[in-house]
UniProtKB/Swiss-Prot annotation:
Main location class: nucleus
InterPro entries documented for this protein: Med22 (IPR009332), Med22_Saccharomyce (IPR016530)
Protein name: Mediator of RNA polymerase II transcription subunit 22
Gene3D superfamilies hit by this protein: Mediator of RNA polymerase II transcription subunit 22
The gene coding this protein: SRB6
Pfam family, one: Med22
Oligomeric form and interacting partners: Component of the Mediator complex.
Family label: Belongs to the Mediator complex subunit 22 family.
Keywords: Activator, Nucleus, Transcription, Transcription regulation
Keyword Nucleus: yes
GO molecular function: transcription coregulator activity
Protein's job: Component of the Mediator complex, a coactivator involved in the regulated transcription of nearly all RNA polymerase II-dependent genes. Mediator functions as a bridge to convey information from gene-specific regulatory proteins to the basal RNA polymerase II transcription machinery. Mediator is recruited to promoters by direct interactions with regulatory proteins and serves as a scaffold for the assembly of a functional preinitiation complex with RNA polymerase II and the general transcription factors.
GO CC list: core mediator complex; mediator complex
Originating organism: Eremothecium gossypii (strain ATCC 10895 / CBS 109.51 / FGSC 9923 / NRRL Y-1056) (Yeast)
Compartments it resides in: Nucleus
């Protein structure tokens, strides 16, 4: 991904996270004035139950949205780390890929002579 795509996705994700968090805060401060009323009829109890159930469902939906947003942030940070790590690996030229077997043989013989001493044939 290009830098601009990552930045755009980061902006969208942070905006989504802030909106979901704001909604959760708003839902957590439900007006309790209707719950504290002195009326003991069943209509009020049913409406309080309905509001509470609806509130729980909304909290669940916004919490799920927060979780998805955090997962998106993890994907973005992984992409940034991969880009950073892979950008530090030097690229090899095609000429450097060829193995010089004669040079390897000379180095091996020199190392063997240094380690074991010259071998007489």
């Amino acid at each position: 991904m290009s830098n601009q795509v990552l930045l755009d996705k980061l902006d969208r994700t942070t905006e989504s996270l802030s909106q979901a968090l704001a909604q959760l805060v708003k839902l957590s401060s439900i007006d309790r004035a209707s719950a504290d009323s002195d009326g003991d009829n069943d209509g009020t109890t049913d409406s309080i139950t309905s509001v509470a159930t609806n509130g729980v469902m909304m909290v669940h939906a916004h919490t799920t949205q927060l979780i998805r947003g955090v997962q998106d942030l993890l994907v973005i940070t992984r992409a940034i780390r991969e880009t950073w790590v892979l950008g530090q690996i030097p690229k090899k030229n095609g000429d450097e890929d060829a193995i010089d077997y004669e040079k390897c043989e000379r180095l091996l013989e020199k190392a063997m002579d240094d380690f074991f001493g010259p071998v007489a044939l």
